[in-house]
A protein has these predicted regions:
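Conserved alpha/beta-domain cores
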Residues: 1-200, 206-208, 220-223
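Gly/Pro- and small hydrophobic-enriched strand-loop and loop-to-helix capping segments
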Residues: 210-228
Length: 228
């Protein structure tokens, strides 16, 4: 708990400096604590430290972890990993936001499942693939217009904006063009939310207009358990 409090204070200082450079306000940034592969105790400690938004990559992992958390007041859980179609029905009651919608088919299934569960509209973001990495998921920019128009009318989804994961660079400045490109696409399609920036490059993301940053290592330290 003490380490998370200290790390969060350092992160907040870095956020404040990036916001000052870009003449923005703290209220414009949602800090998502990425708790994938960490135990439920880490999520609870982060919540006690004042964090309210949490990111998970794997539906099955969070399905196991969720009952251990109990009711956390004001907590919001974001799915930030690839969502397979066969996991939609499990994901829908677990998450408040799915940031990795990359096809109209997936969006349709989410909307249908949300309706069937009798839940209010699900917040979603569209994941955009801006690199050539085969390991990355997302909609290609040239197909984004069709996806946006396919998702907007769905009655049980609420389209917030765009999300991307650039290649990892030691130099965070190399991520900046990817962030700038996502911002341009958001402006083009009149979308307000931009989920971009992780522990290594979130300051550059904030300077380029991020509204949601996803931080794991900066808050919790390096993971010792392999992802998967």
């Amino acid at each position: 708990m003490e380490r998370i409090v200290e790390n969060l204070a350092e992160v907040e200082e870095r956020i404040a400096r990036a916001l000052a450079r870009s003449r923005r306000h703290r209220s414009e940034i949602t800090l998502i604590a990425v708790t994938k592969t960490f135990p439920a105790s880490a999520t609870l400690a982060a919540w006690q430290a004042g964090l309210r938004d949490f990111g998970e990559n794997y539906v099955q992992e969070f399905e196991t972890k969720s009952p251990l958390l109990g009711p956390l007041e004001d907590a919001r859980f974001h799915l930030i990993g690839h969502l397979q179609s066969n996991k939609v029905n499990k994901a829908v009651p677990l998450f408040d936001c799915v940031q990795t919608v990359d096809s109209a088919r997936l969006a349709g299934r989410l909307s249908q499942s949300r309706a069937g569960a009798g839940l209010p509209p699900l917040d979603v973001m569209l994941e955009v693939k801006l690199s050539d990495e085969e390991s990355k998921h997302g909609c290609d920019p040239e197909n984004l217009a069709v996806l946006v128009e396919g998702v907007r009318p769905l009655p049980h989804l609420r389209l917030l904006g765009l999300m991307t994961i650039p290649p990892f660079f030691e130099d965070p400045e190399r991520s900046r063009p990817y962030f700038a490109r996502l911002r341009e696409l958001a402006v083009k399609y009149e979308l307000k939310a931009l989920s971009m920036g992780m522990s290594n490059d979130f300051e550059a993301a904030i300077e380029e207009g991020a509204t949601h940053i996803r931080l794991g290592t900066a808050l919790f330290g390096r993971r010792t358990k392999p992802a998967g």
